[in-house]
Swiss-Prot record:
Disease: Meier-Gorlin syndrome 5: A syndrome characterized by bilateral microtia, aplasia/hypoplasia of the patellae, and severe intrauterine and postnatal growth retardation with short stature and poor weight gain. Additional clinical findings include anomalies of cranial sutures, microcephaly, apparently low-set and simple ears, microstomia, full lips, highly arched or cleft palate, micrognathia, genitourinary tract anomalies, and various skeletal anomalies.
Entry keyword Lipid metabolism: no
Mutagenesis / variant outcome for changing residue 106 to A: Does not change protein stability after CHX addition during mitosis
Positions of modified residues (Phosphoserine): 45, 54, 74, 106, 127, 419
Protein name, UniProt field: Cell division control protein 6 homolog
Taxonomic lineage: Eukaryota, Metazoa, Chordata, Craniata, Vertebrata
Region (Disordered): 1-91
């Protein structure tokens, strides 16, 4: 059995050698006949390396010499490894040939890349020199036209809108007197280490918070040795929550437990410490701290007058007579009475000065016409004197003009655009745009739909508005609580035999009227104590509702 296996192995490789000998004999027909011993020597001779196997499997000079002389028969399959020579590795051979080709061609590629890069640099330099000498080239015209298509007049409008925002500006014209009073008060008490209290009152949008914020920012750079704490009381859930908020700002740590005697004692000890810094406590929307017995407000106004106190209290609210009407006990104690400073509504000339000062920061060519600015100031000063409203109206008018200009510019063909050398004159905001915005904001919100269509104002909301109007006339006050309003509303519904909604739905109706801009709400932790007031003139409401039969009857008969 071993002999048969060895013979079988010899017969497998024998035809390959026989095939190579036959080919060699065909080429060398003039040679003598070889003996069987010579056959074995031929197989071991160096000529076997030059036998015409597949050229792709040969390496070195043998491959170059024998590549043209292809064998007449088909070469062995390349995928099988056993067909090759004993020590030949096809993958290694292919990789060596490929690497040699790379090493031969890589220097030329690098040189070509350098030459190509030098050509590009030279062309860029030439193009730069040409553009400096001649500015009217076709590529430049196309680029400028594409840029002008989207940025023709948008930059000036965006800059104007940025300066007309309601943030605290660097300059506050028309409030020099009030700012001098606040600045002198703070310098006197901070530099003199003297406690005190100041109450700022005025309608919304008259610059109370803006003036105080600007002065405090300036004093931080000028004076040292004081700490500022600013709290907006609208963010507090209850009036008692102001004490944990103050303790958190002073101690720089969270206070989880509710305000009690221990916390009050801790705050008073911190404010009366001998080596402690001066504390400037600013409470915005201070009238939201209204509580039973006004204990919170009395405690806050008594803190500056404790022995060795270094607290400077500044309260800000819309109510003019807060200290007189809500805190009458402060009148009995003269030293606890705060210094009062009222911010009157802005006049027409002051609003014009503020708007022009903002617009002059952008460019000399104003986006708004002078007549449009005068018209906006006159309308706003006649209603409320709120400068924030004037800024919003102007910004909205600029947005309308900007949208019109962008739509026209985008739809204009590229060939119709003016040349870049011609100056671009932006479209200015005129009286028409200001009037359009004011009619949207301050127009007749009570106007109903025309041509016999269904009213856009629901019946329950109209009855609630009539009840509020009659209640204000009867009590001769401007604000009523939601509880009293609901009682009057229920009486009117019973008299007119109309189904009334419950108190929670009455609050929802008030919220819808607030969204329309008809009512204003001063919310409280207790729903019945939420204050309701009109945001538009009563004559306008009466004129819009008196034509209807049911509403006219309610207004004529009054409250039952």
């Amino acid at each position: 059995m071993p002999q048969t296996r060895s013979q079988a192995q010899a017969t497998i490789s024998f035809p390959k050698r026989k095939l190579s000998r036959a080919l060699n004999k065909a080429k060398n027909s003039s040679d003598a006949k070889l003996e069987p011993t010579n056959v074995q020597t031929v197989t071991c001779s160096p000529r076997v390396k030059a036998l015409p196997l597949s050229p792709r499997k040969r390496l070195g000079d043998d491959n170059l010499c024998n590549t043209p002389h292809l064998p007449p028969c088909s070469p062995p399959k390349q995928g099988k490894k056993e067909n090759g020579p004993p020590h030949s590795h096809t993958l290694k051979g292919r990789r060596l040939v490929f690497d040699n080709q790379l090493t031969i061609k890589s220097p030329s590629k690098r040189e070509l890349a350098k030459v190509h890069q030098n050509k590009i640099l030279s062309s860029v330099r030439k193009s730069q020199e040409i553009t400096t000498n001649s500015e009217q080239r076709c590529p430049l015209k196309k680029e400028s036209a594409c840029v002008r298509l989207f940025k023709q007049e948008g930059t000036c409008y965006q800059q104007a809108k940025l300066v007309l925002n309601t943030a605290v500006p660097d300059r506050l014209p028309a409030r020099e007197r009030e700012m001098d009073v606040i600045r002198n008060f703070l310098r006197e008490h901070i530099c003199g280490k003297k406690a005190g209290s100041l109450y700022l009152s005025g309608a919304p949008g008259t610059g109370k918070t803006a003036c105080l914020s600007r002065i405090l920012q300036d004093l931080k750079k000028e004076l040292k040795g004081f700490k500022t704490i600013m709290l907006n009381c609208m963010s507090l859930r209850t009036a008692q929550a102001v004490f944990p908020a103050i303790a958190q700002e002073i101690c720089q740590e969270e206070v989880s437990r509710p305000a009690g005697k221990d916390m009050m004692r801790k705050l008073e000890k911190h404010m009366t410490a001998e080596k402690g810094p001066m504390i400037v406590l600013v409470l915005d929307e201070m009238d939201q701290l209204d509580s039973k017995g006004q204990d919170v407000l009395y405690t806050l106004f008594e803190w500056p007058w404790l022995s060795n106190s270094h607290l400077v209290l500044i309260g800000i609210a819309n109510t003019l007579d807060l200290t007189d009407r809500i805190l009458p006990r402060l009148q009995a104690r003269e030293k606890c009475k705060p210094q009062l400073l009222n911010f009157p509504p802005y006049t027409r000339n002051q609003i014009v000065t503020i708007l022009q000062d903002r617009l002059n920061q952008v460019s000399r060519d104003q986006v708004l016409d002078n007549a449009a600015v005068q018209f906006c100031a006159r309308k706003v000063s006649a209603v409320s004197g709120d400068v924030r409203k004037a800024l919003d109206v102007c910004r909205r008018a600029i947005e309308i003009v900007e949208s019109d200009v962008k739509s026209q510019t985008i739809l204009k063909p590229l060939s119709e655009c003016k040349s870049p050398s011609e100056p671009l004159i932006p479209k200015r905001v005129g009286l028409i745009h200001i009037s359009q915005v004011i009619s949207e904001v301050d127009g007749n919100r009570m106007t109903l739909s025309q041509e016999g269509a269904q009213d856009s104002f629901p019946l329950q909301q109209k009855i609630l508005v009539c009840s509020l109007m009659l209640l204000i006339r009867q009590l001769k006050i401007k604000e009523v609580t939601l509880g009293k309003l609901y009682e009057a509303y229920s009486k009117v519904c019973r008299k007119q035999q109309v189904a009334a909604v419950d108190q929670s739905e009455c609050l929802s109706l008030s919220g819808l009227l607030e969204a329309r801009g008809i009512l204003g709400l001063k919310r409280n932790k207790e729903t019945r104590l939420t204050k309701v007031f009109f945001k538009i003139e009563e004559k306008e409401i009466e004129h819009a509702l008196k034509d209807k039969a049911l509403i006219g009857n309610i207004l004529a008969t009054g409250l039952p």
